Structure formats: structure tokens, C-alpha cells
């Protein structure tokens, strides 16, 4: 039985402490302080009908703009998103992609989501209870990360916004991450309650920012780019902690992605910047990035 969830992430931050150190302290404090019971997975014999896979989440799973399929549903779900590739990789007997561009945690659990083609029910309501594999990509819209990072954008080539040295920027980032962990934990708990025998995999964020900026695709100084990259590393720390404390699995999609950020050459780029091409979305993984994400997930579930 679910007894209680972590009510907050403790923030420990002194004046010149960087974002990485501050959020690392927050994650460690959360892990040490949280005491709760998470619904354990129900032991079940291997499904005779094969893997029954359900993909949940936001645009990082949906893959808007990757192909024409994404234009035929209000959620922007593409056949080139990592869920389709994972379904093929595991030889899924059934596959249901419920991810929806713009989704926040509440749209997965209990709140209908408006789309360009009407309102869709909460994703969990449409998820079959006999699912044996569930992936989840979530969190980016909860914290509205583009707004947080946009404070680092320079207004001219060669400029430096200096967001890395702005306490207000760090405070906003820390506040956003502080509220994210409990939301993701609750979402994982709701998934477990709906599909008690499922293997649940939480897929991480990041990959867009590397160690440098590139005008105008990522109009950010090299030093601030490192800050932004660190922000996503800390976001992944929060997600990984939610997974670890809920008995689910976490996949870091930035592993193996060095040199494939939005400032990489077009043929090496897996994640788009602000100026994406017609077959990808700004600030999202492109088809190559989705293939990488699928490979990372398959490395865990196969």
C-alpha cells in the first residue's frame, strides 16, 4: 500500500555555490530524508502473449514534426519517436503510444489535456492494466525549462548573458527542480497502481546543450552553455532519485551523446537547437536522437 510521498526536496545552497553542487545536495538530502512505501510490482509469470508495451509522456516521447504521422493527431505522435523503435526492438505483441506533446505530470495521471484536435483523457486512464512494459518521459513541461534557460541567451553574436553568475537564475532553477521530484514520484506511483505487473522505465532529459554555444541556433556563451548542461544533469539527478526511491528504472539518454548536441555539425546532431529543420522540432531530439534514446532504453529492457 502507498503510505506517503516525499513532500519536498530539501534545498541546501550557500552564496557562491554553483547549481550542480546545490542540486546535488538537494538530491542527496531527498534520498536520505524520504521514508515511504511505494507499491511493489506484482510478481507475474512471463506473459504468454509477449511484451505489452505502453509509452507515456510528453513530446520527448511523441516526436512532433518527425514525420507526417505526427501531423494527424493532436498530440504530435510520430512513428519515428523512440517508443515505436523500442516496440520494434522488443518485438512487442501490443504497443500503445499515449504520449502527448505538451504533457505535464498531471496529464499523465488525472487531468485531461487540451490539444489542437480536442481534449484527450489522462494517459493512465487509457493505459491497459495488463501492460508489462511502460516507459515515461516527463518533467520538461512541469518546470517549463525553455523559460529557465532562455535567461542565458545572448542578444548578439559573441555575447554573454552571464546567467551562470546570477543568483536569481539559480534560485528559479532550484525552485523548479525542488517541485519536480514529488510530481514525478507520484506519477510513477500512479502508473504502478494501474499496471502492477509492469516494468516501468523513466527516460531522462537533456542532450541539447554541450560545452559551447553557437549563434543563432543556441545563442549562449560557452560558459553559460556549461551551466545549462549542468542544469539538465541536475534535472536527471532529480528524475533518477524519483526512480530509485520508487523501485523503477532510470535511463540516462545523455550517456553516449557527447558531441551530438545542438551545436554539432548537421550530420552529427542528435538534438536540435532553436532553429530546427522541417523534419524536427526546435529544442527536441531529431530522428537520430530518437534512435539513440531507443538504443539506451533497449539496453536496459532487453
Question: Which residues does each predicted region cover?
Answer:
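Secretory targeting and sorting signals
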Residues: 2-45
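Short amphipathic alpha-helices and their capping/turn segments at secondary-structure boundaries
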Residues: 41-52, 85, 116-135, 140, ...
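Serine-esterase "nucleophile elbow" of acetyl-processing enzymes
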Residues: 45-102, 153-157
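Structural recognition of the beta-strand scaffold that forms the well-ordered cores
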Residues: 52-57, 61-63, 94-99, 132-137, ...
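Oxyanion-hole/transition-state-stabilizing segment in secreted/luminal serine hydrolases
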Residues: 64-66, 117-176
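Charged, often glycine-rich, active-site loop that binds/positions anionic groups
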Residues: 102-121, 262-277
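Conserved N-terminal glycine/acidic-rich loop preference
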Residues: 133-136, 158-192, 201-242, 246-250
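Catalytic His-Asp segment of secreted/periplasmic serine-dependent ester chemistry enzymes
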Residues: 206-302
Amino acid at each position: 500500500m502507498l503510505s506517503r510521498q516525499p513532500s519536498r526536496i530539501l534545498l541546501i545552497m550557500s552564496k557562491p555555490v554553483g547549481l550542480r553542487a546545490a542540486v546535488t545536495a538537494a538530491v542527496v538530502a531527498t534520498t536520505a530524508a524520504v521514508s515511504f512505501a511505494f507499491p511493489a510490482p506484482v510478481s507475474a509469470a512471463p506473459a504468454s502473449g509477449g511484451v505489452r508495451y505502453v509509452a507515456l509522456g510528453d513530446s520527448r516521447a511523441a516526436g512532433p514534426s518527425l514525420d507526417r504521422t505526427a501531423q494527424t493527431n493532436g498530440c504530435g505522435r510520430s512513428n519515428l519517436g523512440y517508443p515505436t523503435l523500442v516496440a520494434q526492438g522488443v518485438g512487442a505483441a501490443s504497443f500503445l503510444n499515449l504520449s502527448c506533446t505538451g504533457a505535464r505530470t498531471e496529464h499523465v495521471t488525472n487531468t485531461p489535456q487540451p490539444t489542437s484536435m480536442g481534449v484527450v483523457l489522462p494517459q493512465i486512464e487509457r493505459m491497459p492494466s495488463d501492460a508489462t512494459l511502460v516507459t515515461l518521459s516527463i518533467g520538461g513541461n512541469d518546470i517549463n525549462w525553455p523559460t529557465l534557460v532562455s535567461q542565458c541567451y545572448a542578444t548578439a553574436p559573441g555575447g554573454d548573458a552571464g546567467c551562470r553568475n546570477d543568483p536569481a537564475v539559480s534560485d528559479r532553477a532550484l525552485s523548479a527542480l525542488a517541485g519536480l521530484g514529488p510530481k514525478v514520484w507520484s506519477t510513477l506511483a500512479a502508473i504502478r497502481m494501474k499496471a502492477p505487473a509492469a516494468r516501468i522505465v523513466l527516460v531522462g532529459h537533456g542532450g541539447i546543450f554541450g560545452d559551447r554555444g553557437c549563434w543563432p541556433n543556441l545563442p549562449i556563451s560557452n560558459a553559460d552553455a556549461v551551466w545549462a548542461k549542468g542544469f539538465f544533469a541536475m534535472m536527471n539527478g532529480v528524475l533518477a532519485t524519483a526512480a530509485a526511491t520508487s523501485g523503477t528504472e532510470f535511463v540516462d539518454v545523455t550517456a553516449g551523446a557527447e558531441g551530438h548536441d545542438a551545436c554539432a555539425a548537421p550530420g552529427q546532431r542528435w538534438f536540435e537547437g532553436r532553429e530546427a529543420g522541417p523534419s524536427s522540432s526546435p529544442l527536441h531530439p531529431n530522428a537520430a536522437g530518437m534512435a539513440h534514446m531507443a538504443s539506451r532504453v533497449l539496453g536496459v529492457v532487453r
